[in-house]
């Protein structure tokens, strides 16, 4: 992160208390944390399970900001992370509906406590003339990795929470961004908070 972003910022937890953490920490920091929920879902790794979960959101008009899914340490079980905005009441409704699906084993709202969140972004940027040194400088500031180099481009890999990735994109001249892909967020509870069978 740029040095100016290391100022202490308040963090709100689900219990309504707030603490101060530095922006550089990997604890999720969001302006409306209570409205942005990260749901972690264990479900059976079967054909159609993903489409039924997504269909539930669509049928009831719930929005999905990001979605990631992959097998867990048990290959018969997948873990899905859904980021969805909504009031606590709406998220409670979503959780109840998800728990009614046969394939769903367990649902946890990670935003009800402390958790770590990460997202991966690959961005191809123009790197010619003065832009080349500027892109290298920004990559270093945001602790990225240059994973591909040509005489005209850099491909940069960045990981962090969505605020960090958004801050990088704002720092780069839009005309320099040639292509970008993001994975969506995944999260895990801190300390003894675990989601398993």
Where do the PLM segments sit?
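Short, small-residue-biased leader/transition segments that mark boundaries at the very start
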Residues: 1-9
């Amino acid at each position: 992160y740029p040095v100016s972003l290391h100022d202490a910022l308040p963090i709100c937890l689900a219990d309504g208390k707030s603490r101060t953490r530095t922006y550089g920490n990997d604890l999720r920091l969001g302006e409306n944390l209570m409205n942005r929920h990260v749901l972690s879902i264990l479900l059976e790794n079967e054909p159609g399970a993903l489409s039924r979960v997504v269909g539930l959101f669509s049928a009831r008009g719930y929005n999905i900001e990001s979605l990631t899914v992959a097998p867990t340490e048990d290959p018969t079980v997948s873990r899905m992370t859904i980021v969805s905005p909504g009031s606590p009441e709406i998220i409670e409704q979503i959780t109840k509906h998800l728990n009614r699906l046969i394939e769903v084993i367990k649902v946890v709202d990670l935003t009800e406590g402390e958790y770590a969140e990460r997202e991966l972004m690959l961005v191809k940027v123009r790197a010619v003339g003065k832009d080349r040194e500027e892109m290298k400088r920004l990559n270093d500031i945001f602790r990225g990795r240059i994973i591909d180099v040509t005489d005209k481009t850099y491909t940069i890999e960045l990981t962090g929470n969505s605020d960090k990735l958004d801050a990088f994109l704002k720092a780069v001249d839009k005309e320099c961004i040639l292509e970008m892909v993001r994975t969506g967020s995944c999260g895990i509870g801190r300390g003894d908070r675990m989601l398993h069978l």
